[in-house]
Regions:
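Helix-to-loop junction immediately C-terminal to a conserved catalytic motif
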Residues: 47-48
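The feature captures the beta-strand-to-loop junction immediately N-terminal to the Walker
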Residues: 32-34
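Conserved structural motif at the start of ABC-family nucleotide-binding domains
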Residues: 2, 16-19
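ABC ATPase NBD Q-loop/coupling interface
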Residues: 57-73, 136
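Walker B catalytic motif
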Residues: 164-165, 172
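ABC ATPase C-loop
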Residues: 152-153
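Conserved beta-strand-loop-alpha-helix hinge in the C-terminal portion
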Residues: 213-238
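Q-loop/switch helix immediately C-terminal to the Walker
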Residues: 84, 90-104
């Protein structure tokens, strides 16, 4: 459960997000809005990116999220993916997962974790020995997104914010993505917030709520998902 009260985000004194009062309980939620309105900013600010100044209040499963350091937010169960995942030379995909699981006090059985990693990679159609390849280095956009899906499965957070998880994926990969996101939420007490403009993904996920951000940094949250389909057909000004 994530609840924001008059949550405002500023960069260099400029307001990007203005007095957002939103609630995200267990289930699937979609965030939409024109380019540049702060959809990615919302995720980064919640995760504790120091480039953003925040005001207001954010409660995460009963805890004051804004009082936590970034690593504490991760340990509390918050996970975000990125529009453009960063490559890290010299660090393999599995080494990254292994270290993350240690840091988050997750299962540290190397043999079991490696087996699970390889199974997830196979499910997603990634190359053999994907675990040994360097993190996001010489990987396509779609492969980077699949890598983040493996991370989501293995780190098993309480709440995940995925920034355009469908980017770079073909139709078959989108189908697998939907299956895995559904499986994640179906574990119970899991919250998934997705930033997407892809009609196929939104239709298949059938989200519980829709949040629309506008160019003034305001937000409207609704359970009327038909609005999403109208936007996809006619645009934000339609």
């Amino acid at each position: 459960m994530l609840v924001t009260q008059e949550f405002t985000v500023k960069v260099d004194g400029n307001t990007i997000l203005n007095d957002l009062t939103l609630e995200y309980g267990p289930g699937i939620h979609v965030i939409m809005g024109p380019n540049g309105v702060g959809k990615s900013t919302f995720a980064h600010a919640l995760m504790g990116n120091p480039n953003y100044d925040t005001e207001g209040a954010v409660e995460f499963y009963g805890k004051d999220l804004l009082a936590m350091e970034t690593y504490e937010r991760a340990r509390a169960g918050l996970f975000i993916s990125f529009q453009t995942p960063t490559p890290i030379e010299g660090l393999s995909n599995f080494q990254f997962i292994r270290q993350a699981m240690v840091s988050l006090n997750k299962n540290n059985n190397i043999k079991e974790n490696l087996s699970n990693f390889r199974q997830s990679a196979t499910d997603l159609g990634l190359a053999s020995e994907w675990d040994k390849k360097q993190l996001n280095l010489e990987a396509s956009g779609g492969e980077k997104k699949k890598n983040e899906l493996i991370q989501l499965e293995m780190l098993d957070p309480k709440l995940a914010i995925l920034d355009e998880p469908d980017s770079g994926l073909d139709i078959d990969a989108i189908k697998i993505l939907v299956e895995k996101l559904r499986a994640f939420v179906d574990k119970g007490d899991k919250t998934l917030i997705i930033v997407s403009h892809y009609a196929e993904l939104i239709t298949k996920l059938n989200p519980d709520t829709l949040t629309i951000l506008d160019k003034q940094g305001n937000a409207k949250q609704t359970e009327d998902i038909q609005i999403a389909y109208d936007i996809l057909e006619n645009g934000f000004n339609g």
